[in-house]
From Swiss-Prot:
This is NAD(P)H-quinone oxidoreductase subunit K 2. Binds 1 [4Fe-4S] cluster. It is an enzyme of class 7 (translocase). Keywords: 4Fe-4S, Iron, Iron-sulfur, Membrane, Metal-binding, NAD, NADP, Plastoquinone, Quinone, Thylakoid, Translocase, Transport. It comes from Cyanothece sp. (strain PCC 7425 / ATCC 29141).
Amino acid sequence: MSTPLDHSIRNPISSAEVPPELSENIILTSLDDIYNWARISSIYPLMYGTACCFIEFAAMIASRFDMERFGMFPRASPRQADLIILAGTLTMQMAVPTRRLYDQMPEPKYVIAMGACMITGGMFSADSPTALRGADKLLPIDVYIPGCPPRPEAILDAVTKLRKKIANESPQERQNLQQTHRFYSIAHQMRPAPPLHTGKYLLSETRQQPPQALAEVMGMNIPAFQSPEQQELLLQSGQQRELISREVDEAYKSSSKMY
């Protein structure tokens, strides 16, 4: 049985035309893009702050900045959060609890360091025996927000940069892109130190009566700064400070055993 010949070309040289009703209903993408699109639209930050910068983060919850338009809903449990914003000063005493919260967060998880104190130690980096000089010594930081304190607009800009970073990454490659030059772990060998300012310097003999060698160099007698009665009162106050410092040391040692 013969059939009529079909003179239409099945495989034309030119590109095939896609009907408009078909092009408006088909999207070409990959599973990674869909996965990242879902994650950037549902970033759940942890409600965690260590100092004053957290007040600026709390301002984002209000209607003026409205972080919920980014799909950000604050969570009180680290097991329900995938973003931790480190806001404020990180001390040696809070380093271990902060690391414990980070370990309890499910993968993939991200960290934003907010404020000068969290990035470099800030004004506490000069002579503070307890401040941590940068949170990147403890956790892998994804975005840094400089400022003292940063404005809520800067936090939104950091969230936008984090969303771009999430959109361009692959879940298979994230484990290979972890920082390797930091020592962010429990075994960071950082131990709390006893307080340095105990008031014992007030008991020094040369504090009230200059040393004899200084008087010989100057060629004149240097009188004492305090009278004997005042020195006796100062000695009593110094003994009280020493007693208080001992109580503080004992309380400090007992609290450090908890960690």
